[in-house]
Amino acid sequence: MSEAVTYYKEHEAEDAMSVLAGWMGQNSKVKVIYHSGTAVDADIYKGIIRIPRMACASGITQEALMLLRGRVYHEAGHIDETKLPKAEFPQGALKEILNALEDRRMESVESKKHKGCEIVFRWSNNYFNRKIAEQITQKKADAPLWEALVAMSFMVEGLQPAWRLGGKAQDYVDAAYSEFIKVKQCANTLEVLALAKVIYKLLKEVNDDYKQDKQDKQDKQDKQDKQDKQDKQDKQDKQDKQ
């Protein structure tokens, strides 16, 4: 089937997805906000989903429709399944790890609850695997933690990352994947948070080693620079005495 075939007018598809979001989120008051930016997120406490408006004036193509479905299903799934007291929601690197893990657990649960979700999530994983590979290959992304987390997310779903991981990202994967894969055993978001904390410690050790190695190299360079400067001065002093 051609990717160029159109199925719905733009707002017809968005309206349909808004209804599905409420059904999946088990809340008829779930609100989907379409905007002109690039952010995709859900406020699980207020039941609000924010996703970019599809720029398809002539109609929604197959790819655009699948992308729209994937975004809405995913964020509605978080509203349905991701339950964590607001005060316990972490920030920083731990938040990134939690989000990556919870994405995998939530999608697995929603795929069992709702017929049709699995094929959409599988399509999305393949789509973003290609897109992320393009970003990294074109040097548009340089974030080892993010790179490692998305790589492990694909690996858990049986996909090999479609790019060669950077050195630090690969070290992160080597250190944490044996724990990351346990996410499918987690029964809820609190258990995922506990797993995220374990992985955070492992990744912090890797990062600390990188920092120490960088500091050692800098210290060595500083020492060499100091010695070179002293040698140069000694040579100059010797010439002055002659």
Description of each model-found segment:
Residues M1-A141, V150-R164, D174, S178, ...:
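Basic/hydrophobic alpha-helical interface regions
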Residues K131-K241:
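Pan-zinc metallopeptidase signature
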Residues M1, K241-Q242:
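Accessible peptide chain termini
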